[in-house]
């Protein structure tokens, strides 16, 4: 028995030790109890409130309903079940949690009202809570289906068991103010559904009776519509609060009588809902602007038919190819099989968001027979409710144009910069901030010209503080003429691809939003320029390197064109030359996959060999030279490290890289999940990175500040506020022992239904890129590097693993890559994270055309490239990544990644050496920037520390020793006991023999 127990204990120790070894990094992070200091916490919470204050968008305010008078309206009725389940943000890696790791904010809207000394109708709220206690499953979109995580709950206003006559009559007596809360939440792995699942709380599929197929998740439900109609007809003042992670259809605000005001507040994070009463009662004037176009009908978007789950196509002949060969871990857990190999056609071309709606208006599309017949509209006013950049205030501003350079009427040159100085004068009754937006409208050449929107955001600025009544502030807006160029991928103007500024007329416009000119008091809101002849940008103005097609044509590094022309996709892309016949009204029928595409579904030994053949001239690098250069002292940069961080091309880098051992290179590259591994040969300890565009450490024991969702930050239109956000999160990261941050999320709001839209900024590449640049600047000043995500084509969640994303190279560059380029060039960004899907036919994390040809050879990017979490190692694999130009493989929670192809060639070892250079430069560059930053200028405290969750390791070791020692004791005890038994048995046997000998003679006698 002792031996059995001992064997069990030894097996247990081995099993626990192996498991802890595999999960050591995550266990340490999860168990960390490192708390923010009071200074960091206070700075973060104050900033979160400011972000919410500046990000709230007021879209309607009839009869100056807002602001409310606190003396007259100290009591309010809060209607809508969503008020009891206030949304902090979306689900997934960008989530926010409260101080106890829960999903209900420490300060929700109701608590915010109470804290502001506003009394709300408790009986009304109690009724909602008794109707449905919580929003089930929404916080776990990674493990649920959309029909579980995206459900709507609202009692019918006609249900007298809920809305009793007594309850409604008392509510009218309680207050003449009704605030109606509408809530929507989506998240990672599930796009918002195009149907409604209602009033069903059980896990699993929703009964047909609880599904409304006539409305989408982002429309109001019939129950919400009836409630809004009731309060609109009953109450003197009605304010609608939109607490949503996604752009809702707000057409009801125009159609239902009595709805006075509307505030878009987004997900407010853990405590920033406290800002809302300050806005509602006029302590703060709204200054946010919409970052998406609000249309009356989602289907008027050119992306509608080819987005979300309904927009995904499935190749007919791919049932035995990845990922159809396994389960989909990203949509509803392990019970959901992939139907086949999926693809997504970006048939809308470059025309997303306002770039579609405004261009369609310029072309008369909204008054065409097509539009009239399909949607029953007759003009822009029937299609767009709130344009991009729209927002109201409690005050009025008058704009004076102070100076323009170059002067109106000038001919622009290749390297010109356009500068517009304006003065904004507060002509209203209260203080407030104001946003000025600058757009350009290029001339479009229908015959043979490049695709281009009718209008594009070029620059924006916001008054840094509230302007007092009767006072003015001056703002300067500027942009490079090269920002107006569009990419020519089909050789219309130049063979081989380049950015081109076509000859013609260009008008710069000062605008209130993407549709309406600003009524300036002096000067002109429009500035006309001209380009005499085509200007070609075939050299990148920042890097000085060649610009050319990387994804279009026949001879391509990745083997396939991103637009599908070389693989027989037959995609018809929309063109401005003929919107009516090219508008993608419905998704095309599923098609077959070409044989040559089938052969490249997964990375193979032959692919690795082909790469090696193309790099056969590589020389074997020196490894493990044993030198004594130390750019690191543990996690900290030495003086040498700071000097190397200042210059990627410092010749001493070669000596440092020579010292790194091959085993250290392997460990660094292979195991990049939330860490940059130890490199003892140069003095570097393991550094840790953390996820969370809204909140660092949201998956750990003690999280950082839960900020409003990133979209709210973008709604502020304030790049300096974005820098402050980067400062705050970077400082928190340092205080909690982290060196890197998985942020910002800078994919596009291609569709309102994108599950992770809340993590991303907007539908506009310029706004997205400039906000991201601000965040990057601030974070780097604290010494915290960032991995901006997700590069590229990750604009929806449905079937994200291995999704083939087909688009033109112009679309790729002008829309989706532009935010990354801006963040790198203007924000100093030194880290990017790749995506789950494919850019065309090739996984983005393994695309040599993307990571080497474009990112490094064209853009001159010297930082690190990290993959996203590798669910399937046979697809998102380290072999393909390192050869394509990636650096860190996020091989997963168990850190079990390994190379499957050869790793002894000179080319391979050189690729690993390059990866180390990129990663180390990223880390040291952040340290260098921090060393030249004075935090006192921003009133912030930055104190670095180590993660303290590693206490469990010595405890485990001691426990192992005690258990093994106990097992050994049992074995020894068992042996001794066995020996004792044997001795006793032997003694008994001898005694028996003696007795036998004595008895024998008597027997014989």
Summary of predicted features, one role per range:
Residues 1-514, 550-1005:
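Glycoside hydrolase catalytic-domain context in secreted enzymes
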Residues 516-547:
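Short beta-strand elements
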């Amino acid at each position: 028995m002792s031996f059995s127990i001992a064997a069990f204990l030894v097996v247990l120790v081995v099993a626990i030790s192996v498991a802890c070894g595999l999960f050591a990094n995550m266990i340490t992070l999860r168990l960390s109890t490192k708390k923010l200091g009071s200074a960091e916490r206070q700075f973060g919470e104050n900033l979160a409130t400011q972000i919410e204050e500046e990000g709230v968008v007021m879209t309607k305010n009839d009869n100056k309903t807002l602001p409310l008078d606190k003396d007259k309206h100290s009591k309010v009725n809060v209607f809508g079940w969503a008020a009891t389940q206030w949304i902090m943000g979306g689900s997934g890696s960008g989530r926010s949690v409260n101080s106890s790791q829960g999903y209900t904010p420490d300060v929700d809207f109701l608590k915010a009202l109470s804290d502001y000394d506003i009394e709300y109708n408790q009986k009304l709220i109690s009724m909602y809570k008794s109707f449905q206690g919580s929003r089930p499953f929404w916080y776990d979109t990674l493990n649920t289906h959309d029909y579980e995580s995206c459900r709507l709950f609202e009692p019918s206003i006609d249900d007298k068991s809920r809305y009793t006559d007594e309850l409604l009559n008392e509510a009218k007596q309680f207050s003449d103010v009704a605030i109606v809360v509408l809530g929507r939440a989506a998240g990672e792995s599930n796009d918002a559904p195009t149907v409604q699942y209602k009033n069903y709380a059980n896990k699993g599929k929703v009964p047909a009776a609880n599904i409304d197929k006539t409305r989408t998740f982002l429309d109001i439900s019939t129950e919400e519509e009836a409630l809004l109609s009731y309060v609109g007809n009953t109450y003197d003042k009605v304010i609608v609060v939109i607490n949503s992670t996604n752009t809702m259809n707000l057409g009801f605000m125009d159609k239902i009588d009595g709805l006075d005001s509307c505030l878009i507040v987004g997900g407010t994070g853990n405590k920033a809902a406290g800002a809302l009463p300050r806005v509602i009662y006029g302590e703060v004037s709204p200054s946010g602007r919409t970052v998406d176009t609000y249309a009356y009908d989602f289907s008027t978007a050119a992306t509608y038919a080819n987005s979300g789950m309904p927009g995904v196509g499935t190749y007919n002949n791919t049932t035995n190819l990845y990922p159809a060969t396994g389960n989909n871990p990203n949509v509803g857990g392990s019970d959901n099989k992939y139907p086949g190999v999926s693809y997504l056609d970006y048939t809308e071309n470059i025309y997303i968001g306002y770039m579609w709606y405004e261009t369609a208006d310029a072309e008369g599309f909204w008054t065409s027979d097509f539009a009239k017949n399909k949607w029953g509209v007759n003009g822009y006013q029937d299609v767009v409710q709130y344009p991009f950049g729209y927002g109201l205030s409690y005050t009025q501003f008058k704009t004076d144009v102070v100076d323009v350079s170059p002067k109106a009427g000038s001919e622009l040159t290749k390297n010109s910069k356009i500068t517009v100085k304006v003065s904004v004068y507060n002509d209203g009754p209260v203080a407030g901030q104001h946003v000025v937006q600058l757009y350009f409208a290029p001339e479009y050449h229908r015959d043979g010209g490049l695709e281009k929107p009718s209008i594009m955001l070029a620059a924006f600025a916001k008054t840094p503080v509230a302007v007092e009544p009767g006072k003015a502030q001056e703002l300067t807006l500027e942009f490079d003429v090269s920002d107006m160029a569009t990419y020519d991928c089909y050789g219309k103007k130049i063979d081989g691809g380049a950015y081109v500024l076509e000859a013609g007329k260009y008008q710069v416009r000062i605008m209130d939003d993407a549709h309406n000119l600003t009524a300036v008091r002096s000067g002109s809101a429009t500035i006309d320029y001209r380009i005499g002849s085509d200007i070609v940008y075939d050299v990148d103005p920042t890097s000085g390197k060649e610009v050319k097609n990387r994804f279009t044509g026949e001879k391509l590094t990745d083997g396939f064109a991103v637009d599908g022309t070389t693989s027989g996709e037959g995609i018809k892309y929309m063109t401005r030359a003929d919107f009516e016949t090219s508008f993608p009204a419905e998704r095309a029928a599923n098609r077959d996959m070409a044989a040559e595409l089938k052969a490249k579904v997964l990375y193979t030994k032959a692919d690795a060999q082909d790469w090696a053949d193309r790099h056969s001239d590589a020389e074997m690098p020196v490894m493990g030279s044993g030198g004594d250069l130390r750019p690191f002292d543990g996690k900290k940069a030495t003086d040498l490290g700071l000097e190397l961080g200042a210059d990627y091309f410092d010749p001493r880098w070669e000596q440092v890289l020579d010292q790194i051992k091959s085993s250290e290179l392997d460990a660094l590259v292979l195991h990049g999940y939330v860490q940059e591994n130890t490199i003892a040969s140069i003095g570097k300890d393991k550094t840790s990175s953390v996820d969370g565009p809204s909140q660092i450490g949201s998956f750990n024991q003690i999280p950082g500040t839960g900020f409003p969702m990133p979209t709210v930050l973008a709604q502020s239109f304030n790049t300096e506020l974005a820098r402050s956000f980067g400062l705050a999160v970077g400082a928190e990261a340092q205080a909690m022992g982290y060196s890197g941050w998985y942020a910002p999320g800078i994919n596009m709001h291609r569709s309102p239904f994108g599950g992770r839209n809340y993590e991303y900024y907007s539908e506009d590449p310029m706004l997205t890129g400039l906000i991201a640049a601000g965040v990057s600047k601030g974070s780097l000043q604290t010494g915290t590097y960032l991995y901006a995500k997700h590069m590229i084509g990750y604009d929806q969640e449905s079937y994200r693993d291995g999704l083939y994303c087909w688009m033109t190279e112009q679309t790729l560059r002008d829309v989706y890559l532009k935010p990354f380029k801006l963040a790198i060039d203007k924000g100093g960004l030194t880290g990017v994270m790749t995506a789950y899907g494919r850019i065309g036919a090739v996984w983005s994390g393994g695309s040599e055309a993307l990571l080497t040809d474009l990112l490094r050879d064209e853009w001159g990017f010297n930082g690190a490239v990290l993959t996203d979490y590798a669910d399937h190692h046979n697809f998102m694999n380290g072999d393909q990544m390192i050869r394509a130009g990636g650096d860190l493989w996020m091989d997963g929670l168990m850190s079990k990644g390994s190379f499957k192809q050869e790793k002894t060639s000179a080319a391979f070892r050189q690729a690993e050496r390059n990866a180390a250079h990129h990663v180390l430069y990223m880390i040291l560059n952040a340290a260098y920037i921090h060393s030249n930053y004075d935090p006192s200028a921003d009133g912030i405290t930055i104190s670095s520390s180590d993660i303290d969750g590693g206490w469990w390791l010595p405890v485990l070791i001691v426990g192992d020793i005690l258990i093994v020692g106990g097992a050994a004791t049992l074995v020894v005890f068992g042996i001794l006991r066995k020996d004792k038994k044997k001795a006793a048995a032997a003694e008994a046997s001898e005694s028996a023999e003696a007795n036998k000998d004595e008895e024998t003679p008597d027997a014989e006698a």
